[in-house]
Amino acid sequence: MKNFISINGKKTELTEEQVQQIKASFGFNSVRLSSVDVGETVKIGDYELIVLEQSGDTTALICKDFIESCAFGDSNNYDGSKVDKLCSTFATGLAKIIGEDNVIQHTVDLTADDGLKDYGSVKRFASLLTTDLYRRYVYTLDKFKPDAWWWLTTPYSTPTHDHTSWVKCVSPSGCFSNGLYDFNVDGVRPFCILNSNIFVSK
C-alpha cells in the first residue's frame, strides 16, 4: 500500500519510515498488524478491535465494543437486515481509513442452527460472527465479554421448518441463546478480515 502526502497541491509518495515518523509525531504507537498477537487489541480510527486470528497475509478481527444496539431486522435472515447494513457501513468507514484494498471480502454462511440452508451464504467486507466462527474464537472472545447480549448471523431455523422469528445471540456469560429479530435489542460487533501488512495503533 503506497502512502502519499499533498503539499500545495503536489502529491508526494512517502517512504514507510516517513509514515511512521509522522504517526509517531502525533503520539501513535504504530505497528504492523501482522506483528500483533491473537488476543491483543489494536486501534484503527475510532475503532478498537480484537485480533482473533493471524493467517498468512490476513488478520481476522472483531470490534471490542458494540457499534450499536438494536433489533436484528425485519426477519431472522441476516442478508439485508438492519445489522447487516450496520456492518456494511462499518466496513465502508474502515476502508476510508486503511484503503479499500486492505479490507478483504469473506463469505458468511447463513446455515441455520438446525442445519437448514434456505438463506444460503453472502459475501461481505464486514459481518457479524456465525455460530461456527464464535466457537472457533471462543477462548479469545471470552477474555472480552461485554455486559450485554450481542447478535450472531445464524438463524435458529428457517421457513422450511415454519420458523423465522429467532436468531442466535450470545449472552453476557458467553453462552448461546436465541433472540426475537424484531423485539430483542442486542449489540452489534462487526467481524472483518484485513490485510495484515497495514499499520495500526496499539
Per-region residue spans from a language model:
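Collagenous Gly-X-Y triple-helix signature in extracellular proteins
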Residues: 2-202
